[in-house]
C-alpha cells in the first residue's frame, strides 16, 4: 500500500556485519510496523551487506542481486561493507581506490529504495540505525554515511543493539519484562545473548543488562542450543525470550524450545 497523502515515515534500519533489515511505520496510521521484503512478493527480509560493480562500467548492484551478478557475470563483489567503512582504508575496485564510507552510503541509498513498496525516501521523517556496537569510530562512520544520503530530515539517530533491546522492552507490557528478559542473536559461529533484569528494590527501578557470547561451531545444532538455553534459563524466572537471526526462522530447534 502506497501513501496517498503527506504522511511521514519512520524508518528503522538494522545494520549488521553481513545483513541489513529495514522496517517502517507510517505516522498517523493504524497499521503496524512493517518489515520490508528484499525480494518482491516474498518473505525474505534480510539484505546481504554487499555491492558489486560491473567491470569497466559505473553500474552497481546491491544485496542478493550483487552476489548473483558477481557469480554469473564478471562483476566485482565487495562484501563486509560495515567493517571496511570502520577500518577506513580505500578499497581497490576496478583499478581505482574508493572511499569505503562512500560504498556504505551507496548501499544505504540503494537499499532504502525498498521503501518504494510503501512510499519514497522524500517522506522519511526520521531514521534510526541500529548496529551491534556503537563506539566513537562507528558513530563517525554512520554520521558520514547518512550525511551522504541527503535526506530531507535531521531526525537521524543511532543505537547499539543493547540500547535497542532495552528501549524495546520498556515499551512492552510489564508482564513481558517483570522478570528476566532474554534476547538470543544468531551470528557467525556464535550465539550472542542479552539478558535484561530490573531491580525493583531501588527507587527509581534500575535495569541491568548482561551480554554474553557462546561458541556455536555446528550450524543449527539443536543440542548445542539446548545447552545454551539451560545456562541462560535454569533456575531463573524468565518473562520472555526473543530469537533474532535468519537461522532461527528455520525448523531445527525441536528440544531447545521445550
Language-model-detected regions and their locations in the chain:
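Gly/Thr-rich phosphate-binding beta-strand-loop-beta motif of the actin/hexokinase/Hsp70
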Residues: 2-39, 170-211
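Short flexible coil/turn linkers enriched for glycine and charged/polar residues
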Residues: 16-18, 121-123, 133-136, 186-190, ...
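Phosphate-binding loop and its immediate beta->loop->alpha context
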Residues: 28-149
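A generic secondary-structure signal
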Residues: 110-118, 145, 168-172, 227-232
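Local beta-strand N-terminus motif with an aromatic residue
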Residues: 124, 178-179, 237-240
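Extended hydrophobic secondary-structure segments that form protein cores and membrane-embedded regions
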Residues: 126-131, 158, 183, 240-245
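Conserved phosphate-binding/catalytic loops in two-lobed NTP-binding clefts
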Residues: 151-165, 254-258
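Helical "lid/coupling" subdomains associated with nucleotide-phosphate turnover
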Residues: 217-258
Amino acid at each position: 500500500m502506497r501513501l496517498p497523502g503527506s504522511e511521514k515515515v519512520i524508518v528503522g534500519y538494522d545494520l549488521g556485519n553481513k545483513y541489513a533489515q529495514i522496517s517502517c511505520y507510517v505516522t498517523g496510521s493504524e497499521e503496524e510496523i512493517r518489515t520490508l521484503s528484499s525480494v518482491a512478493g516474498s518473505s525474505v527480509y534480510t539484505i546481504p551487506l554487499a555491492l558489486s560493480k560491473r567491470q569497466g562500467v559505473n553500474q552497481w548492484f546491491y544485496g542478493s542481486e550483487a552476489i548473483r551478478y558477481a557469480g554469473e557475470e564478471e562483476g566485482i563483489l565487495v562484501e563486509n561493507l560495515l567493517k571496511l567503512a570502520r577500518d577506513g582504508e580505500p578499497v581497490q575496485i576496478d583499478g581505482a581506490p574508493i572511499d569505503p564510507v562512500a560504498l556504505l552510503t551507496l548501499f544505504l541509498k540503494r537499499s532504502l529504495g525498498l521503501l518504494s513498496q510503501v512510499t519514497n525516501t522524500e517522506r522519511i521523517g526520521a531514521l534510526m540505525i541500529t548496529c551491534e556496537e556503537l563506539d566513537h569510530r562507528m558513530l563517525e562512520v554512520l554520521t558520514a554515511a547518512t550525511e551522504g544520503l541527503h535526506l530531507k530530515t535531521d531526525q537521524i539517530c543511532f543505537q547499539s543493539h543493547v540500547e535497542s533491546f532495552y528501549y524495546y522492552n520498556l515499551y512492552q507490557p510489564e508482564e513481558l519484562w517483570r522478570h528476566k528478559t532474554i534476547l538470543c542473536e544468531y551470528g557467525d559461529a556464535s550465539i550472542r545473548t542479552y539478558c535484561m533484569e530490573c531491580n525493583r528494590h531501588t527507587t527509581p527501578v534500575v535495569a541491568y543488562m548482561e551480554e554474553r557470547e557462546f561458541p556455536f561451531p555446528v550450524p543449527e545444532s539443536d543440542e548445542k542450543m539446548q545447552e545454551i538455553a539451560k545456562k541462560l534459563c535454569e533456575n531463573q524466572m524468565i518473562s520472555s525470550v526473543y530469537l533474532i537471526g535468519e537461522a532461527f526462522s528455520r525448523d531445527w530447534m525441536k528440544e531447545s524450545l521445550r
